[in-house]
């Protein structure tokens, strides 16, 4: 009897030791993963099909999601770049109220709501956008409206809001897009939403290495003047494979090639990770 009890106790002790070791190793991996992803500013230009979504992770200062696609692929896209045990995103920014930019927020709000929601103050008459605002209000999430001249400071980095001006009447939702310039030490990125070429005058002295192309590479949203003003070395295009709009348009691709701009598009490259190091580092997920 004693012999059986000793064997049983030894077996249980071994199991407990193994469980303890596994938990200890898991704990190390979790903490290593959380700390590692906060060392430098990282920007994930997410593959969400025919839409835009960019996750920005600031060093020790939280995360911001700019746009979220139409909702069909946002959870899958985020799961490929975020720690499984940390799904929270601090701030959501909506460039403008088109479904292919805000639809994903509806998929995330029930399980992972933000602390703040930032947008341009221009509402869509669509019922889905009204639903998003209703859910934000129900969860007591502040809706903050930003305009030209405003700034968002996060640690050593900041966003400048270049468009739209306050109290300006804009009929086209695309042209109401929040235009944001992210600056981190010696690197910068410009986000144009879906704004058309009409806004080019507002981009003087806004040179940026990285350009999030407007309106998925549409020829109505890019001109030679804009490329000359911004002088990008990298262009990001959020676009669905074989989309019915034929984005990006050949004219835009040829223009970028003319200026030796490196082109990354989600339909061909998948999610694109950009790390703001001494130099810009780029990793493709596909």
PLM region spans:
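Non-globular, low-confidence helical/coil segments that flank catalytic cores
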Residues: 2-286
């Amino acid at each position: 009897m004693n012999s059986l009890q000793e064997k049983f106790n030894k077996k249980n002790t071994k199991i407990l030791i193994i469980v303890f070791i596994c938990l200890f190793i898991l704990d190390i991996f979790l903490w290593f993963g959380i700390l590692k992803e906060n060392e430098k500013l990282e920007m994930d230009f997410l593959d969400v099909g025919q839409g835009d979504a960019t996750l920005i992770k600031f060093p020790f200062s939280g995360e911001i999601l700019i746009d979220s696609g139409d909702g069909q692929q946002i959870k899958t896209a985020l799961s490929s770049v975020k720690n499984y045990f940390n799904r929270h995103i601090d701030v959501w920014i909506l460039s403008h109220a088109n479904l292919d930019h805000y639809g994903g927020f509806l998929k995330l709000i029930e399980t992972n709501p933000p602390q703040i929601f930032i947008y341009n103050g221009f509402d869509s008459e669509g019922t889905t956008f009204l639903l998003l605002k209703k859910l934000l209000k129900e969860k007591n999430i502040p809706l903050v409206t930003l305009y030209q001249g405003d700034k968002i400071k996060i640690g050593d980095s900041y966003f400048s809001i270049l468009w739209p001006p306050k109290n300006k009447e804009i009929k086209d939702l695309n042209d109401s897009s929040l235009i944001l310039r992210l600056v981190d030490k010696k690197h910068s990125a410009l986000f144009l939403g879906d704004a058309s070429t009409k806004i080019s005058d507002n981009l003087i002295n806004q040179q940026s290495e990285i350009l999030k192309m407007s309106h998925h590479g549409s020829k109505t949203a890019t001109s030679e003047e804009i490329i000359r003003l911004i002088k990008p070395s990298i262009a990001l295009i959020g676009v669905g494979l074989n989309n019915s709009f034929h984005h990006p348009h050949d004219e835009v691709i040829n223009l970028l090639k003319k200026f030796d701009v490196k082109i990354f598009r989600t339909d061909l490259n998948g999610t694109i990770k950009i790390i703001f190091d001494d130099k810009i580092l780029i990793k493709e997920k596909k």
